[in-house]
Structures are given as structure tokens and as C-alpha cells.
């Protein structure tokens, strides 16, 4: 009887751990590392803007897998168009030039079950330190 109780408790702990992990990684987490005052922020990144972003990408264990900072060349892309992982499209939205954010991106908003080559394993949560370098728009901006 004692073995059955131990097995039931162990099974319940396992199930609780699985649900806690899934819940923890379900949403994009955005941390502000450097905030820009409203007086200095004359423009926020919006869907359709072409943005330039410096970043350092890490796995949860701290392994750096990519860094535009090390290359000295920010990445440039149209925001909200799916040209980057969904966690980036969501996490850069609303940033001001000069603002820095820490984006903790769960697998389903990153590279998911397939990962990315030999660099990013399947089901990886990614951590990016980002800085918005510039915003370029042609006067034709979509609403948030």
C-alpha cells in the first residue's frame, strides 16, 4: 500500500512539474533594460516600420549563439511581417530608438520543435538582449 501511495505522489509531482514548465514558457517575457523618457521618444516602432536592432542571443544555459553587436552590424527588417521569429515581431513592437529590452522567448514563438540547424536545439527558450538602433518608415504606417 505504501508503494502505491509513493507512486501516486511521484506521478502527481511529475504532472505538476510538466504543467508548471508549460505555463512558465507560454508567453513572451519583456524586460526593460534601458527606458527612454517620453520627451526623448518621438517615435515608437510600429508594424510596417523597417527597424534596425542590435542584439545578443543566448540559450537558457547562457551560451551565446549569435550577436550583431560582435559583428558591428545591426539586423534590419520590416516589423510585424513575419521576416523574423514571432517573439521578435512582438517584442520589438513599441520600442523607442535607444531603448534596450531583454526578450525571453518561448519555443513556440522562436524556432519550435525543429530548432535552427546545429546552433539552436529543438524546443529552446531563447533570451535576447536587444537595442533599437533606428526606425525607418515611408509615412505609411499601420496601426498597432
From Swiss-Prot:
The keyword Cell inner membrane does not apply. PROSITE patterns: ER_TARGET (PS00014), FKBP_PPIASE (PS50059). It holds the Pfam family FKBP_C. Its EC number is 5.2.1.8. Inhibited by both FK506 and rapamycin. GO terms for biological process: chaperone-mediated protein folding. Keywords: Endoplasmic reticulum, Isomerase, Rotamase, Signal. Residues 1-20 form the signal peptide. GO terms for cellular component: endoplasmic reticulum. The keyword Transmembrane helix does not apply. Its main location: endoplasmic reticulum. It comes from the Eukaryota. GO terms for molecular function: peptidyl-prolyl cis-trans isomerase activity. A motif (Prevents secretion from ER) lies at residues 141-144. Residues 48-136 form the PPIase FKBP-type domain. It is found in: Endoplasmic reticulum. It catalyses: [protein]-peptidylproline (omega=180) = [protein]-peptidylproline (omega=0). Belongs to the FKBP-type PPIase family. FKBP2 subfamily. PPIases accelerate the folding of proteins. It catalyzes the cis-trans isomerization of proline imidic peptide bonds in oligopeptides. This is FK506-binding protein 2. It comes from Yarrowia lipolytica (strain CLIB 122 / E 150). The lineage of its organism: Eukaryota, Fungi, Dikarya, Ascomycota, Saccharomycotina.
